[in-house]
Each structure stands twice: as structure tokens, then as C-alpha cells.
Amino acid sequence: MSKLVEELKDEFDYIILDCPAGIEQGFKNAIAAADRALIVTTPEVSAIRDADRIIGLLEANDIHKIDLVINRIRMDMVERGDMLSKDDVLDILAVDLIGIVPDDENIVISTNQGEPLVGSNTPAGKAYQNICDRVMGKEVPFMEITGPTFFQRLAHVFKK
């Protein structure tokens, strides 16, 4: 894997390897060539535990540029105390935050339609674009993620 990545570096500015979450050989092969890591996790206790273990493995392999993406956060659940907040996750993992992606039904829709979501005018699409911009070194403010409004919840009830 390292040799392949070295060859690709001549052709591309960024090489992204999506590796398995576990500590098996596939993960070890992927991080062997890494100079940076983006940890993607959901704000659930078991996912945070896995992310913390992965961060430890990355640091043990001299990968210290580690950024975090919190995926599928739902502010209504955070406000009820049913989901960890952004601050809770950051306190536990102690790495830099590069993006927060709200839970968005458009993710499923775009995946099923084979359409990219990055750059679209959806909450998740905007969040993905912001992450891309931050990876490229741009200063982009974090989106404010809020729960559904009363009227959005009401509209959802009548859609059914």
C-alpha cells in the first residue's frame, strides 16, 4: 500500500484511503502510508470507544495529524440527553474537529440515486463541502446544527 500511495502522490494532491474501523491487516496497511487521518465517528458511546482505540493506534504508528468528523448528529437527541454532544465527543477524544455532519435523510436519497451530496444545498451537503474546504486549508466557520423546528416536525407528521 505504501508503494502505491507513493506513486500516486506524483499524480494527485490528495489521496484518500477509506479503511476499515477495526485493527485488522486492512487497517494496518492503510495507515502505513498515511501522513494524516480523518476519524469519522457518530456520537454514540460504542462508536466513540472505537474511535478512541483507533486514535491510540494512529498515534502509536507516528500519525499525529488526526482530525475528527462527527457524523449523523441529531440536536434534538442531544438536547434530550439521548446522544453525546459535540463537546462531549471532543472532551473524550481530544483531537481537532474538522467537521460536523447532521443526520440528514438526503444522504440516503442521494446514495440510492447515485448522486453526490457534496456541494448540494442540503445540510449534509454543506457540511461535506465545509470539510473538504477545511482539509484544503481554508478557514470555514462551523455550521450551526439545530434540531427540527416545530413546523418541520409538524410537516413530517403530515407527510406520512
Please place each PLM-identified region on the residue numbering:
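Conserved phosphate/pyrophosphate-binding and hydrolysis machinery centered on Walker-type P-loop NTPases
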Residues: F27, L117, N121, E144
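Conserved catalytic-core segment of NTP-binding enzymes
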Residues: S2-I109
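Residue-identity detector for threonine
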Residues: T41-T42, T111, T122, T146-T149
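C-terminal boundary of histidine-terminating zinc-finger modules
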Residues: T111-Y128
